[in-house]
Amino acid sequence: MILMMKNTKVLETNKDGSIMIYEEKLLPFSLQKEDLTYEDFFFNWLSVRPLSIGRTNAKAILNNAGIPQNSLTIARICHGMNLSDCYWVKEREEDTSWDKDNLYDHDMDPLYADTALTGKSHHLSKDKFHTPELTAQGVSAKCWIKENDGIYLYKVGRKELPASEILDVLGIDHVHYEKAEQLKEYLSKDRIKKIEDVGEIIVRSKLITNQQQGIIPFEEFAVWCANQEIDDEYEEAKRRDEKSYYEMQIADYILNNSDRHVGNWGFYFDVEENKLQGMYPLMDHDHSFDEEETLMSQTNEGKTLLEAARIAQAQLNLPVKDILEIPKPEYLMDNEWEQVRKRVMML
């Protein structure tokens, strides 16, 4: 098997378990280590590219296409292509190329998208398909749709809208979500009604990566830190982009976000140079406005969200009181808004 970065051969595995590295500087960050092995490539990198079986509608996607629930098999079938970077894999004699098959330039299979978002059954082809759904991370129901002005993520997530509005007030860089008014083009009225009847809506956000700039989640950044013998990956993250790191502490407290984890924050990187840049915009706030009053920070060890936010606010002095001047955001419940205002006053 050959690991490619666009049209450049990066690494090749052999049947005897050996590997040949062609472009060391282009290795994925989690593979940048001494004594890289065959097992590192297959089991620590390739096997974690595909979607999680625990993701909503994941089993429907795989079952409808007749794809086994085996991560390496899934990765081989979809060439490990995703919308986070420009890496992909192919067999030595396989007739395919980046220009022919990459997800950024070509239309996507709409049936995969419908199954991914709603769970609807379709006969999906595993022999000829073009979809990022087999490598989309996270657990919520979601899908990618290519439109005239770019690629959009559609997901079930009422809370993304008020979270976006609040972060706009704070001036914190984040992925902007909007109500998916275009939904009628992809789903029937009955399916939209079923989602709205349970108090949810479908929102969309524009893809933040492209063929020049990719992202790596903190989970992979932490592996890279360990391989570079950097003792504290959180301190290293803060050192590399202190402002964004502190903004995340404040955002998670104000939103009372219970779902900041190693897979939904991290860094941009330059695809051609394979060099880390600053943190990418904050995202995934569909578990915000948690009812629990005291949540522990997942990005500042041993601190509550309030304690971590106070440390950050002492550094940034963001205009948090401006939140008190805006009307209650649409789609936010009265009690959720009351708790937001209470947290602002405590900060």
Predicted ranges, named:
Residues 1-250, 254, 268-347:
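Phosphate/dinucleotide-binding and metal-coordinating scaffold of catalytic cores
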Residues 252-257, 262:
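Catalytic-loop of the protein kinase fold
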